[in-house]
């Protein structure tokens, strides 16, 4: 039989191999980019999920405010960092809340707490600590204020806003709150000390007829 042989220049013979090498390089670049993007996506998703879990652990599910544990923790951290600065601790309690639950039902009671939580957010500064620390009890830490009078005026403002706040589910009836105030560092240098003093002031507000603000005096 016959055998045909072709003699090709070396450059022409290498062209197919060069094409394969270029293709492999392009493929590897695309592969590395895709893997990098996938890793970044996984890291981002994990970070977002961890933030959501942390927020869930720190907040009260009903109102979106801080829960009691986080309120206490943030307050203690603030007081330990800013020992020489003046802060006010307010305890707010919805007056006759048990009657609201008894008359309108617990579902309406939850709505009242939710809407009051929104009212708190709209009244105080973004940097202040707002928490739900009991069933119908809320705590507010007003950071870095000059005098107790500032806290008193803000509490009276909230008192007026609450009494004028319309909640449709209450069918024409409004809610009121009582407020007790203590201050740091005068009345204490930790959450529990400030809570106890503000709670005493709150008790005095309740005894004096509710729907009012009382300061703690040692």
Language model features with spans:
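Extracellular/periplasmic juxtamembrane segments that couple receptor/chemosensory ectodomains to their
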Residues: 1-27
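Residue-level recognition of strand-loop junctions within catalytic nucleotide-signaling folds
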Residues: 9, 102, 141-146, 163, ...
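Selective detector of the "anchor" transmembrane alpha-helix that sits immediately C-terminal
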Residues: 25-41
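Heptad-repeat alpha-helical coiled-coil signal-transmission segments
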Residues: 39, 46, 50-53
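Conserved long alpha-helical elements within nucleotide-processing catalytic cores of c-di-GMP signaling
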Residues: 54, 58, 67-88, 95-125, ...
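A structural signal for short, well-ordered beta-strand segments
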Residues: 89, 138, 177-181
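Catalytic core regions of nucleotide second-messenger enzymes
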Residues: 132, 160-178, 206
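Catalytic-core segments of nucleotide cyclases and related cyclic-nucleotide turnover enzymes
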Residues: 152-156, 170, 184-217
